[in-house]
Amino acid sequence: MAGCARASELLVFAAASLKPALDTIISQPQVRAIGPIEVSYAASSQLARQIEHGAPADLFISADEDWMNVVEATGRIVAGTRGNLLGNALVLIAPAQGTVQLRIGAGFDLAGALGADGRLAIASPDSVPAGKYARAALTSLGVWDSVASRLAPAPHVRAALRFVASAETPLGIVYRSDAVSEPRVRVVDTFPPSSHAPIIYPVAAIESDDVGSARRLLGILESAQVGAVFQRYGFDSLKP
């Protein structure tokens, strides 16, 4: 396979929540055979805006469909390559040594669980997918107004995870996959899927000088073997 490797780096733009799983996958021999790969992890909103403004990229994996739609509107997606790669769940987390016990449901006392001066760590609800899902879920359950002034907003979901892992905040809302990858936190409860839109990670190749290599990587990411790796990291594989 060495003769098929490309000389320049394949540039992947990926939602920050994918980092633990994707780092493992990128190190696998079948992926390394493609050639050098660089992954830029950030909030999907930030990555989509970069692509929209002409930043070079070969593959984009977003944490929601809205930001993939923004990229598609630029005309830069390779025809026939967009698809839904992964699913996820939204969870309420606390530091692993914390004692908070809380059942998520309509009107649940999230503000009370934060204590007198505790804040709730979430990704920015105005633009970052994890924060948008969190706000939608809390609004659906009737508790958003009680905590909206007590947020510890983060630039992406992995930063929100770190707030809780370091016990800077008593509670946070992240993806299930984030909690799986961080032993310093525990899941307090999972938000009902009906409280927010389905959490979908779409993927697409971006027009570039080496669409062939991007297609090869996309095929590997959509394989059952790699789907099993994603599942170990807390994602739902949406490919057969």
Where are these regions (language model features)?
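Exported/periplasmic ABC-transporter solute-binding proteins
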Residues: 4-55, 62-65, 69-240
